[in-house]
Amino acid sequence: MNDNFKKQPHHLIYEELLQQGITLGITTRGDGLSDYPKNAFNMARYIDDRPYNITQHQLQLAEEIAFDRKNWVFPIQTHENKVACITKDDIGTNIDTLTDALHGIDAMYTYDSNVLLTMCYADCVPVYFYSTKHHFIALAHAGWRGTYTEIVKEVLKHVNFDLKDLHVVIGPSTSSSYEINDDIKNKFETLPIDSANYIETRGRDRHGIDLKKANAALLNYYGVPKENIYTTAYATSEHLELFFSYRLEKGQTGRMLAFIGQQ
């Protein structure tokens, strides 16, 4: 696949940004220690897995991306649209063990160096933000709830520079095979973007939704230039050899870790 995300042993990396001091990527599912499912490279401490496995996977990833895990930050995601400002004082949060810190946070941003923002995914959309000019990075977790409540708009509220200097990467997530019902479709039709561009009716109370397209449209609507938005072709629901899919695997699966940091 011709994509800006390039395969590595346990992750995909947005390779062209490395020379700009940006480490941006997402883990893949295979060649791990977890039994959930077998040989999974699960990165979530909050599912049925041994803590030892997660720690070993963290250490493996830290070595592969050359970003010490002591500098990682992980929030407790709740499918909302709250955004947290992260500083070096937050490094290590929820990495060795889960705590009450950063609870209810589904997006983070920082202007600090040597901080790796991380969150878990298994169909929801990882949205990465960066500006090398202004030394800004952010990461958002956008499932259908986060997309509908415009979590990308909430992140943009914390950008204190011209949006023409901001770049956004929309990472691997479910494809338009993801379906919603009438009630959820009606919610999306209240957004300030044309739902016909990302929702397709397939039958009674059945509508396919492309959450990647929806988030890209919202970003553009709120001022991010189209040419500054990159959307990967990788999809969790179409590439099960690489990714976990909560919906296709009926919840019995692991989680990938999306990450972004700057040197």
Curated annotation (Swiss-Prot):
<dbReference type="GO" id="GO:0005507">
    <property type="term" value="F:copper ion binding"/>
</dbReference>
<dbReference type="InterPro" id="IPR038371">
    <property type="entry name" value="Cu_polyphenol_OxRdtase_sf"/>
</dbReference>
<keyword id="KW-0862">Zinc</keyword>
<dbReference type="InterPro" id="IPR003730">
    <property type="entry name" value="Cu_polyphenol_OxRdtase"/>
</dbReference>
<keyword id="KW-0479">Metal-binding</keyword>
<dbReference type="GO" id="GO:0017061">
    <property type="term" value="F:S-methyl-5-thioadenosine phosphorylase activity"/>
</dbReference>
<keyword id="KW-0808">Transferase</keyword>
<comment type="subunit">
    <text>Homodimer.</text>
</comment>
<keyword id="KW-0560">Oxidoreductase</keyword>
<protein>
    <recommendedName>
        <fullName>Purine nucleoside phosphorylase SAS1121</fullName>
        <ecNumber>2.4.2.1</ecNumber>
        <ecNumber>3.5.4.4</ecNumber>
        <ecNumber>2.4.2.28</ecNumber>
    </recommendedName>
</protein>
<dbReference type="InterPro" id="IPR011324">
    <property type="entry name" value="Cytotoxic_necrot_fac-like_cat"/>
</dbReference>
<dbReference type="GO" id="GO:0016491">
    <property type="term" value="F:oxidoreductase activity"/>
</dbReference>
<dbReference type="GO" id="GO:0004000">
    <property type="term" value="F:adenosine deaminase activity"/>
</dbReference>
<comment type="function">
    <text>Purine nucleoside enzyme that catalyzes the phosphorolysis of adenosine and inosine nucleosides, yielding D-ribose 1-phosphate and the respective free bases, adenine and hypoxanthine. Also catalyzes the phosphorolysis of S-methyl-5'-thioadenosine into adenine and S-methyl-5-thio-alpha-D-ribose 1-phosphate. Also has adenosine deaminase activity.</text>
</comment>
<keyword id="KW-0378">Hydrolase</keyword>
<keyword id="KW-0186">Copper</keyword>
<feature type="binding site">
    <location>
        <position position="79"/>
    </location>
    <ligand>
        <name>Zn(2+)</name>
    </ligand>
</feature>
<dbReference type="Pfam" id="PF02578">
    <property type="entry name" value="Cu-oxidase_4"/>
</dbReference>
<comment type="similarity">
    <text>Belongs to the purine nucleoside phosphorylase YfiH/LACC1 family.</text>
</comment>
<feature type="binding site">
    <location>
        <position position="124"/>
    </location>
    <ligand>
        <name>Zn(2+)</name>
    </ligand>
</feature>
<feature type="binding site">
    <location>
        <position position="141"/>
    </location>
    <ligand>
        <name>Zn(2+)</name>
    </ligand>
</feature>
